[in-house]
């Protein structure tokens, strides 16, 4: 039917255009029932209005479609719901729609499977009142398993039974997007409820594993974002009973994700309600548990269950609300209208008939009769050939433009205020429909007061809960105020202790400041500098062995921050030797200058000044000098060296230069010895020249 791949791709994005194209290929017109909601972007139609030839283009378009967010197919053809045998025979003689044939339902499920497999926008799938067989459900379950976007699935009024539900459960068990399912009126028993309870347990295990993985490294898992069912609707399945309720109670006790469970008209008793109430003691996430329309449950038990569920729903505003009863409908929509058939004529092509719906019988008021005005005038149909006959086609066209008749409000009020006016209430069940005529005390009249009483009870319970919370908060407030006063008292005590400790530390710091005085530290540093200067002089004088004998290490001769003084006694440089040779006699002045320059070290408050070693006369230890001095003067070199050493020791042992000048005799002896040495050296120099 499709010749090119490009056309197929374009058709998948536009359902309406492709549906028109396929209808044109088979020389048919798109059905108004199908086109009604396509302009809104959804596919919603009554399947009873389609013939067999109309399904082919529709299913071919649906199979490849990718742009429909909602697909809703309904069927209301139920011939077994007739009241009497004559009604049953009338329905059986009428035309059976094509959707009731197994081939059409099988092709429909195949098309839905293809749409579910490829569509990424299909979120709602509703099949209402269809007869789905086992092979149809198997194909549909495969599509549900492959769907990546389906959120809501409804098979309401589809008599699939427990076996069909088990097949569907295989498709929805691993779905990551499906949130709500609706199996209202599907002829389920407690076994079907057990299948759904097993699905809940399976998804709970998977969610617990995902929760554990998300809680690692101190993370907080988001339960609302996890996959799984959030609402299950099983209304109007009277065979579920207490066994099904107990199965759900067992799975709900450990479930943290299901938000709503609807069990209206499911044949529950006090035993099943009690099991659900015990499950609510541990389950605080279920916000809707609808067990209404179960007459075997006591009013007190139902009130306790609803109260517990309402307490769970107060924590946050839930998106899942309480649904209305599926069996209560407006009387105007469910009341059957009697029809009168008029045969206009018969011929070779058939007979023309007109079916006219007559209004219900109106009661006659006591006193006067209501006369109808011109706006209520409806002439009786006339047979053909009579004067004033109106063809039925002309009547139908006129009816389209006539609109609704004008009805006065006071007439309706007068009719409703009459004591004998009947009120028709329709009560539907999965197996039959009953029409009852009751007085003003019908269920529909008392439905509004019942709702208001439930709302008042809910408000009263909410008020009691708020008062209880207020009382608890007041007690907590008193405890907190008492604790605050205790903490303030402790804070004052700690502040006093801190002040006393700070004063003690301040007094102790004053004593420690004495050791931090710069004068004391400076005097200690000066003492060490003098000692190191003494060690440097010993080393420069060639008396390092004396320091070693005294137990002073060689590394102690170096003072940190000051350059080490090197000895020039052993090997005097040539320049100094020439300068000594060039010196002429001025013995007295040189001796006095040498006496002034020979000092250990001038100590100041900040640094020390090294001695001028170049002007310090040191006996030359070279062999030439020793030889010349011994040969010329006849004085052994050892004696001369001994004399210089004794004089040096005498100077070193003196406390200071001022102390040596105080003792005149010692100073004169030193001057004489130095003069003698200088004169002897000069003589040796002159002789050598």
Curated annotation (Swiss-Prot):
Gene3D superfamilies: Ribonuclease Inhibitor
Tissues in which the UniProt entry reports expression: Widely expressed. Expressed in different retinal cell types with higher expression in cone compared to rod cells (at protein level).
Modified residue annotations for Phosphoserine: 325, 327
Keywords for this protein: Cell projection, Ciliopathy, Cilium, Cilium biogenesis/degradation, Coiled coil, Cone-rod dystrophy, Cytoplasm, Cytoskeleton, Deafness, Disease variant, Phosphoprotein
Compartments where located: Cytoplasm, Cytoskeleton, Microtubule organizing center, Centrosome; Cytoplasm, Cytoskeleton, Microtubule organizing center, Centrosome, Centriole; Cytoplasm, Cytoskeleton, Cilium basal body
GO cellular component terms, A-Z: centriole; centrosome; ciliary basal body; cytosol
GO biological process: cilium organization; flagellated sperm motility; negative regulation of protein ubiquitination; protein localization to centrosome; protein localization to cilium
Coiled coil: 450-505
Annotated Basic and acidic residues bias: 573-587, 666-689
UniProt-annotated stretches for the region Disordered: 432-451, 563-589, 614-689
Highest taxon above the source species: Eukaryota
PANTHER family: CENTROSOMAL PROTEIN OF 78 KDA
Job description of the protein: Centriole wall protein that localizes to mature centrioles and regulates centriole and cilia biogenesis. Involved in centrosome duplication: required for efficient PLK4 centrosomal localization and PLK4-induced overduplication of centrioles. Involved in cilium biogenesis and controls cilium length. Acts as a regulator of protein stability by preventing ubiquitination of centrosomal proteins, such as CCP110 and tektins. Associates with the EDVP complex, preventing ubiquitination and degradation of CCP110.
Subunit organization: Interacts with PLK4. Interacts with FAM161A. Interacts with IFT20; regulating IFT20 stability and localization. Interacts with TTC21A; regulating TTC21A stability and localization. Interacts with USP16; promoting USP16-dependent deubiquitination of tektins. Interacts with DCAF1/VPRBP; promoting localization of the EDVP complex to centrosomes. Interacts with CEP350; promoting CEP78 localization to centrosome and centriole.
Disease: Cone-rod dystrophy and hearing loss 1: An autosomal recessive disease defined by the association of progressive cone-rod dystrophy with sensorineural hearing loss. Cone-rod dystrophy is characterized by retinal pigment deposits visible on fundus examination, predominantly in the macular region, and initial loss of cone photoreceptors followed by rod degeneration. This leads to decreased visual acuity and sensitivity in the central visual field, followed by loss of peripheral vision. Spermatogenic failure. A male infertility disorder characterized by asthenoteratospermia and multiple morphologic abnormalities of the flagella, resulting in reduced sperm motility. The disease is caused by variants affecting the gene represented in this entry.
Family: Belongs to the CEP78 family.
Name of the protein: Centrosomal protein of 78 kDa
Source organism phylogeny: Eukaryota, Metazoa, Chordata, Craniata, Vertebrata
Gene name linked to the record: CEP78
């Amino acid at each position: 039917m499709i010749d090119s791949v490009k056309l197929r791709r374009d058709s998948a994005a536009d359902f309406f255009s492709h549906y028109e194209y396929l209808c044109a290929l088979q020389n048919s017109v798109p059905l108004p029932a199908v086109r009604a909601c396509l302009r809104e972007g959804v596919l919603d139609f009554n399947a009873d209005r389609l013939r067999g030839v109309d399904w082919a283009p529709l299913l071919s378009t649906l199979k490849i479609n990718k742009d429909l967010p909602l697909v809703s197919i309904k069927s209301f053809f139920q011939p077994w719901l007739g009241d009497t045998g004559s009604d049953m025979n009338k329905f059986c003689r009428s035309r059976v729609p094509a959707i009731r044939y197994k081939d059409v339902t099988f092709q429909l499920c195949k098309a839905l499977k293809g749409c579910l497999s490829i569509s990424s926008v299909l979120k709602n799938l509703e099949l209402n009142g269809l007869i789905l067989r086992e092979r149809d459900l198997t194909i549909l379950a495969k599509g549900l398993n492959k769907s990546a976007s389906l959120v809501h699935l409804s098979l309401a009024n589809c008599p699939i039974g427990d076996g069909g539900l088990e097949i569907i459960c295989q498709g929805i068990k691993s779905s990551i997007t499906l949130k709500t399912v609706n199996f209202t009126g599907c002829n389920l028993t407690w076994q079907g409820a057990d299948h759904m309870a097993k699905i809940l347990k399976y998804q709970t295990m998977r969610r617990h594993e995902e929760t554990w993985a998300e809680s690692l490294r101190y993370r907080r898992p988001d339960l609302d974002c996890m996959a799984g069912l959030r609402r299950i609707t099983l209304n109007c399945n009277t065979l579920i009973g207490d066994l099904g309720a107990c199965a759900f109670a067992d799975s709900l006790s450990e479930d943290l994700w299901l938000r709503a469970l609807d069990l209206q008209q499911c044949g529950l008793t006090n035993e099943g309600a009690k099991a659900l109430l015990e499950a609510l003691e541990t389950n605080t996430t279920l916000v809707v548990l609808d067990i209404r329309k179960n007459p075997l449950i006591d009013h007190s038990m139902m009130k306790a269950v609803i109260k517990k569920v309402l307490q769970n729903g107060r924590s946050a505003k839930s998106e899942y609300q309480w649904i209305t009863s599926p069996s209560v409908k407006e009387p105007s929509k469910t009341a059957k209208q009697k029809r009168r058939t008029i045969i206009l004529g018969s011929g070779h092509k058939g007979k023309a008939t007109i079916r006219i719906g007559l209004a219900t019988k109106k009661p006659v008021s006591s006193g006067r009769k209501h006369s109808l005005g011109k706006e209520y005038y409806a002439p009786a149909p006339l047979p053909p050939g009579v004067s004033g006959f109106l063809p039925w086609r002309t009547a139908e066209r006129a009816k389209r433009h006539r609109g609704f008749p004008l009805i006065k409000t006071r007439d309706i009020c007068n009719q409703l205020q009459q004591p004998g006016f009947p009120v028709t209430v329709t009560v539907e069940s999965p197996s039959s429909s009953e029409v009852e005529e009751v007085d003003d005390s019908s269920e529909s009249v008392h439905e509004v007061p019942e709702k208001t009483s439930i709302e008042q009870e809910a408000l009263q319970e909410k008020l009691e809960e708020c008062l209880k919370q207020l009382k608890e908060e007041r007690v907590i407030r008193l405890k907190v105020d008492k604790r605050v006063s205790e903490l303030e008292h402790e804070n004052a005590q700690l502040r006093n202790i801190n002040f006393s400790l700070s004063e003690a530390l301040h007094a102790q710091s004053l004593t420690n400041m004495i050791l931090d005085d710069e004068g004391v530290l400076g005097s200690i540093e000066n003492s060490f500098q003098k000692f190191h200067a003494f060690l440097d002089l010993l080393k420069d004088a060639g008396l390092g062995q004396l320091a070693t004998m005294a137990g002073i290490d060689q590394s102690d001769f170096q003072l940190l921050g000051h350059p080490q003084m090197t000895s020039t006694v052993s090997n005097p440089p040539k320049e100094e030797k020439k300068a000594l040779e060039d010196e002429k006699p001025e013995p007295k002045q040189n001796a006095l200058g040498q006496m002034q320059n020979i000092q250990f070290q001038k100590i100041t408050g900040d640094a020390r000044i090294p001695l001028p070693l170049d002007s310090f006369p040191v006996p030359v230890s070279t062999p030439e000098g020793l030889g010349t001095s011994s040969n010329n003067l006849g004085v052994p070199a050892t004696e001369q060296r001994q004399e210089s050493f004794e004089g040096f020791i005498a100077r070193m042992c003196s406390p200071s230069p001022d102390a040596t000048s105080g003792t005149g005799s010692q100073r004169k002896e030193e001057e004489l010895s130095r003069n003698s040495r200088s004169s002897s050296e000069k003589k040796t120099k002159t002789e050598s020249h």
